[in-house]
């Protein structure tokens, strides 16, 4: 589980580097999660929400409303990109 968590966090780093092409960045992962793992795409949204909560807890006052909004927008974009193969 820890190794998968590390991969997930690295993928969010990739998202930040590729905000203008999230669907392309996550195309292979979308295919993997849809075709092979049969993951419920709602879980991508849930994971994003959990990540926002964890970051808010970790950064405290530094996690301003502006940072929260940007983070939520990014995790929503990642969730949408991961769910792309399902559409």
Swiss-Prot record:
Keyword annotations of the record: Acetylation, Heme, Iron, Metal-binding, Oxygen transport, S-nitrosylation, Transport
Organ and tissue specificity: Red blood cells.
One cellular component (GO) term of this entry: haptoglobin-hemoglobin complex
Modified residues (S-nitrosocysteine): 34
Modified residues (N6-acetyllysine): 23, 85
Top-level taxon: Eukaryota
A Pfam family: Globin
Binding positions for heme b per the UniProt entry: 4, 33
One GO BP annotation of this record: hydrogen peroxide catabolic process
GO molecular function, one term: haptoglobin binding
Tagged with keyword Acetylation: yes
Residues in Globin domain copies: 1-87
Sections of the chain in a coiled coil: none
Transport among keywords: yes
Oligomeric form and interacting partners: Heterotetramer of two alpha chains and two beta chains.
Role: Involved in oxygen transport from the lung to the various peripheral tissues.
Family listed: Belongs to the globin family.
Protein name: Hemoglobin subunit beta
Species, as recorded: Dasyurus viverrinus
């Amino acid at each position: 589980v820890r190794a998968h968590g590390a991969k997930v966090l690295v993928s969010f780093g990739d998202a930040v580097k590729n905000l203008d092409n999230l669907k392309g960045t996550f195309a292979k992962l979308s295919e993997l999660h849809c075709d092979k793992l049969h993951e419920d795409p709602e879980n991508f949204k849930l994971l994003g929400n959990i990540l926002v909560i964890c970051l808010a807890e970790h950064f405290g006052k530094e996690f301003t409303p502006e940072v929260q909004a940007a983070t939520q927008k990014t995790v929503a974009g990642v969730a949408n990109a991961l769910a792309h193969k399902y559409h």
